[in-house]
Amino acid sequence: EDYGAATLRPNTLRSYEQFIRCYIKPYLGDKIVSRVTRMDIQKLYRKLKHEGRVHEHPEYGHELSDTMVLRIHAMLHRCLKDAERDHIIPYNPTDGTKLPKNSYKPKQVLDREQMDAFLAAVDKNETWRDFFYTELTTGLRRGEICGLMWQDFDEKAGTLKILRSVNVPKAGELEIGETK
């Protein structure tokens, strides 16, 4: 936790903690970091790909998606790169590993008719109407929308200033920070 606390955003830090707890420790936790080899990493990725999901998914079984394996790799690579830089390990065993191809699936986007129907459904609640209208028409992240204040909206210019983002740290209280 101390390792990334100063440089990572709270949600990223939580994701990394989960990756370590659920995916790295069960397979590499009993191994001294300086003894981890490229082959160990390759086996880890293969194992995660085919049986890394803890709870069985109705469509995918215990397989993790290629995207998830790539996210775990990015986190592990960064940690081991820092360990190499600090001379804790002689080389980064994630370098040169074969990674799954990121199988990009196009995102499903609402068409105009679907968007109008959705907004009509939430129209009765002013807060949710404004929230979803902003989300659907701007591409802002959820935390950025939650961080908006009326003073950020310039009605004459028709613009929004995105100055802050709201996150929910582990304890559950709201935290206002900078945007990405």
Q: Which stretches of residues belong to each language-model region?
A:
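Short clusters of hydrophobic/aromatic residues that line enzyme substrate/ligand-binding pockets
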Residues: 33, 94-97, 176-180
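Short, charged, low-hydrophobicity "junction" segments
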Residues: 14-23, 131-144, 174-178
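Generic beta-structure capping elements
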Residues: 46, 99-102, 163-165, 179
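N-terminal core-binding DNA-recognition domain of tyrosine site-specific recombinases/integrases
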Residues: 2-93, 104, 126
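C-terminal catalytic core of Y-nucleophile DNA break-rejoin enzymes
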Residues: 11, 159-161, 171, 176-180
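Conserved long hydrophobic alpha-helices within structured protein cores
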Residues: 37-50, 152-167
